[in-house]
Amino acid sequence: AAAPEWRDLRPHRRARVLYRIGDLIEEHADDLAALQTADTGKTLAETRALALSAAGTFRYTAAALETAEEAITPSRGPYLTMSTYEAIGVVGAINPWNSPIASDAQKVAPALGGGNAVLLKPAEWTPLVSLAFGRLVHRVLAEEGLPTALLAVLPGKGRVVGDAIVRHPLVGRIGFTGGTATGRAIARAAADKLVPASLELGGKSPTIVREDADLEQALAGVMYGIFSSSGQSCIAGSRLFVHRSLYDSFVGELVERVRELRVGPGTDPGTQVAPLVHHAHRDAVA
C-alpha cells in the first residue's frame, strides 16, 4: 500500500510536490531529451517537446488537486451523504517505447496525485529516460521527507516484469499503453483480480480532406500526422482520404513535399525524419 505519510497528505500538499517535480523535469529537459533521442532515435526537437509535455502534465495534475472537491448529496433525511476520494494503494503503469517520458508522466502524475504508490515499467527498448525521470521524482520526494519507494521504475521484459506487476495481488489498478493483444491479456488478468484497468491500445487514424479544406493547413497536418516520430505512433495518420475533386493535385503536392524531407540522425538539428526505434522495424519497412 502507499505510505500513510503520502496517502494522508491533504491534496494541496501533494500538489506542491507535483509542481516541484514538473519544475525539475523542465530544468532537466535537455538532458532528458538527449537520453530519449539516444533510446528512441527521435529528433531532439521532438524529445525536448515531450519532456516539456511531461512537466506540463505534473503541473496540470497539481492544479486539479488544488481545486478538487468532494460532493455532498442533498439530504433526504436526518443524515449526511457525501462522496470522498480514497487512494487505491499501488498502481501499475506499463508504457510503450515511442514516447516514454510523456507516457510516464501521464500515468505517474495522476496516480501519485491520488495518494498512491506507482510501479512503472518502461518498454524494454527504451528504459533510459524513464530511469532518469524516476531519479528526478526520487529527488523531490527525498527533499520533502517522503519515501522514494512511492515510485519504483522496473525495466525488463514485458512477459516477466509486466506480467508480475499485472498479477500481483497488491496492485489495485493497472494502466497500460501498447498493443491490442497485450491489452486483452491485461484486461483478462485485471478481471480475474477484480481491479480496474485503463487501456490505451493501437488503432488506425484516418485523415479526411474535404472539398472545402484549407489545403495548406491540410498538407501540413498530413505531413506532421504521419512523419512525426517517424510514423511510430498509435495516433499517426496512417490512412488518407481526399475528396476526388482535390485528389490529383493534393497527392501530387504531398509527394513532392515527402521527397524533400531530410532523413538523418535524431541528434542533427536539420533532421526531419529520424531513425526507427529498432532494427526489426527497419527491416519490416525495408
Q: What label would you give each PLM region?
A:
Residues E5, D23-D30, G41, A63-E66, ...:
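Generic secondary-structure signature for well-ordered alpha-helical cores
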Residues A15-G22, A33, A51, A55, ...:
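Hydrophobic face of alpha-helices
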Residues L35-T43, I72-P78, D268-A274:
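Short linear capping/connector segments at secondary-structure termini
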Residues A181-A286:
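ALDH superfamily catalytic-core signature
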Residues W6, L24, T43, S99-P100, ...:
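Glycine-/small-residue-rich active-site loops that bind phosphorylated ligands and cofactors
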Residues T37, E70-Q217:
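Rossmann-like NAD(P) dinucleotide-binding subdomain of oxidoreductase/dehydrogenase enzymes
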Residues A1-A68:
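Glycine-rich loop-to-alpha-helix module at the N-terminal edge of alpha/beta enzyme cores
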